[in-house]
C-alpha cells in the first residue's frame, strides 16, 4: 500500500510513500549514464540518462521503487494486487519485464510525451528477476513538470490514463479512483454555507468544516481522495525549502502508523519511507519511519559518467536536536 504525488512551484517535485510491513534494504541509488543496462529481450543500453531514486540492489541491478532521471522525468511503481496482469513475450512488441519497466522508460525518455510513444510499443512481461523474486503486481505513475499519466498492465492490455490530480495509490484501477472523486465534489478548504435549510440557523462551530466527510481511513481509495484533496489545495512559498517542506506535509496526510493497519498477527503496515525528488535539480529528499529529519542526496555531486552504481543507505534512526 503506497501513495505517490506530484507538486509544482518554481521547480517540479515527485515522490511517494512506501507502506509495507517489512523493509527489503532499500537504498538511495544513482544509476550513472554509463552503467550498462542489459534487458532480458531488448538488448543492451550502454549509455543513457542518469537516474536517482530508491531501489533494492540485487546482483548489481537497481530494482527501483521510484526514481527520476536527469531530464526531469519521474516514475514510481505502486501495488496493484489482483488487477495487474503480465504476459508472455509477444512478437512485434517491445517485451520488457515488469522489473525493467522503470529503467526502460527513465533511461531513454526525457518527458511524458516520449514515454507515451515508447509505451505504445510495449508488452510488460511476467519474466521474473529471479526464482526467489517474483514479479511485483504494480501499476505506475509517470510525470514531468507539464504532464502526468498512469500506466496499468491488465487483462485487457496496456492502459494509459491522464492523471490530472497527479496522485496515485493502489486498488481499484485508476479510472475508478478518479470517478470516486465525484462523491467529494462538495468538499472545500473554505467554511461551508448553510444550504441545509434557510429555515434553520445552522452555524459553522469549528474551523475546517468545509472538508467534513474527507476519508480518514488507510484504505487505498480513501488515501487517494485524501491525498488528492490535500495536494490540489496545497499552498506554499515557491522557494526550495518551503516547497520540500510542503511536499512532505502532503504525503504525511496519508502516513501509516504502526498498530493501525494489521496485515497478520502482530504485523503492521507502516510508512517505511517517504520521498520527495526535485526533478529539476536532481536532489532526492527522504524521511523514514524512525528518521523524521529530512535527508538528501544530490545526483549532480556524483560522477554521472561513471559505469558503477552509487548507493547511500537510508538513515533510519531518529535524530533529535536538543536546544539546551
For each predicted feature, which ranges?
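Broad, structure-driven detector of short, well-ordered beta-strand segments within folded domains
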Residues: 28, 68, 149-153, 275
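Long, compositionally biased
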Residues: 135-159
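C-terminus-biased signal that marks the final domain/tail of proteins
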Residues: 1-13, 118, 127-130, 135-136, ...
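Short, surface-exposed beta-strand-loop junctions and turns on beta-sheet-rich folds
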Residues: 20-22, 81-83, 156-159, 166, ...
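Short hydrophobic/aromatic-rich beta-strand segments that constitute the beta-sheet cores
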Residues: 75-77, 160, 284-286
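Proteins synthesized as precursors that undergo proteolytic processing into mature forms
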Residues: 92-128, 240-248
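A contiguous strand-loop segment
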Residues: 1-94, 126, 311-315, 319-324
Amino acid at each position: 500500500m503506497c501513495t505517490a504525488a506530484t507538486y509544482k512551484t518554481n521547480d517540479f517535485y515527485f515522490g511517494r510513500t512506501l507502506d509495507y510491513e517489512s523493509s527489503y534494504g532499500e537504498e538511495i541509488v544513482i544509476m550513472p549514464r554509463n552503467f550498462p543496462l542489459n534487458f532480458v529481450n531488448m538488448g543492451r543500453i550502454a549509455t543513457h540518462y542518469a537516474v536517482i531514486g530508491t531501489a533494492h540492489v540485487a546482483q548489481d541491478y537497481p530494482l527501483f521503487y521510484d526514481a527520476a532521471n536527469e531530464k526531469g522525468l519521474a516514475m514510481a511503481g505502486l501495488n496493484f494486487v489482483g488487477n495487474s496482469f503480465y504476459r508472455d513475450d509477444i512478437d512485434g512488441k517491445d517485451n520488457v519485464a515488469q522489473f525493467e519497466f522503470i529503467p526502460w522508460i527513465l533511461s531513454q525518455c526525457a518527458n511524458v510525451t516520449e514515454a507515451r510513444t515508447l509505451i505504445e510499443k510495449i508488452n510488460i512481461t511476467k519474466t521474473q528477476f529471479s526464482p526467489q523474486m517474483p514479479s511485483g503486481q504494480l501499476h505506475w505513475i509517470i510525470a514531468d513538470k507539464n504532464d502526468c499519466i498512469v500506466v496499468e498492465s491488465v487483462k485487457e492490455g496496456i492502459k494509459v490514463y491522464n492523471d490530472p490530480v497527479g496522485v496515485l495509490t493502489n486498488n481499484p484501477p485508476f479510472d475508478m479512483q478518479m470517478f470516486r472523486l465525484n462523491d467529494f465534489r462538495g468538499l472545500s478548504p473554505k467554511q461551508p454555507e448553510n444550504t441545509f435549510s434557510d429555515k434553520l440557523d445552522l452555524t459553522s462551530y469549528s474551523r475546517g468544516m468545509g472538508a467534513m466527510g474527507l476519508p480518514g481511513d488507510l484504505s487505498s481509495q480513501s488515501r487517494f481522495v485524501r491525498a488528492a484533496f490535500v495536494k490540489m489545495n496545497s499552498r506554499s512559498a515557491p522557494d526550495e525549502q518551503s516547497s520540500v517542506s510542503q511536499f512532505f506535509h502532503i504525503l504525511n496526510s496519508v502516513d501509516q502508523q504502526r498498530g493501525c493497519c494489521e496485515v497478520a498477527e502482530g504485523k503492521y503496515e507502516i510508512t517505511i519511507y517517504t520521498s520527495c525528488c526535485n526533478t529539476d535539480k536532481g536532489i532526492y529528499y527522504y524521511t523514514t519511519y524512525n528518521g523524521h529529519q529530512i535527508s538528501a542526496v544530490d545526483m549532480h555531486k556524483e560522477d554521472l559518467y561513471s559505469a558503477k552504481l552509487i548507493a547511500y543507505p537510508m538513515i533510519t534512526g531518529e535524530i533529535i536536536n536538543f536546544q539546551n
